[in-house]
Amino acid sequence: KKLISFNKINETMVVQSGMLLSEIHAICEENDMLFPLSLASEGSCTIGGNLATNAGGVGVLYYGNTRELTLGLEVVLSDGSIINLLKTLKKDNTGYSLKDLFIGSEGTLGIITAASLKIFQKPKEKFTFLASSRSPKKSLEFLRMIQKSTSIPLTSFEIMNNNSIKTVLKNIDGAILPISEEAEWYILIEFSSYEKNLDAVDRINEIVNLGLEKKIISNAVFANSKKQSKQIWNLRENISEAQK
């Protein structure tokens, strides 16, 4: 498992499929870049597994799933022959997109051994908050309202039920729910700004207040620090672990 190439100008990287997702994140972090596929299991899952299952992750709403983040593949077929599709060209409209057959096929068509991935500029700022709502329908209504109300990139919108949050609070040390009133549903929302936006907080506050006034959401708490943001994300990322 190794990094084959990293091109900050072209915003691409080529890696072997055995690399952990967390290792890819670390390489991008060192170079002030971002690979936006993000999963709670990133410390143990490989990019090859992510490709084989076409993983979505918490950034799928804005960046797309793994298929949308992949430019090319190297694949070994059942007869041992190797297909090299490791392109790094973004505007490539030639021929069949064979990579799309292998992504999500779970190894049934061939074994993915390397991949060309898209990387992105790292956001300058992130704004995280946790809201509560009465139902999934109300949560989706809030999503539509956000999408209509601002051009600030909405990079995460995760709906979580009360039972899942209770399980995390019970079984994960240090887990904290920043909203004082219990709710049936919770929404983790994160905006990312790729330039310093002095009006972003005010605009997001306006949207949240409108959601509260219209009773689309019941409550909302902003993360005022990276520590508070991490506490909110820990609720979402530990749901699977808390159920073991």
Regions found by a protein language model. Give the residues of each.
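Noncatalytic alpha-helical scaffold of FAD-dependent oxidoreductases
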Residues: K1-K244
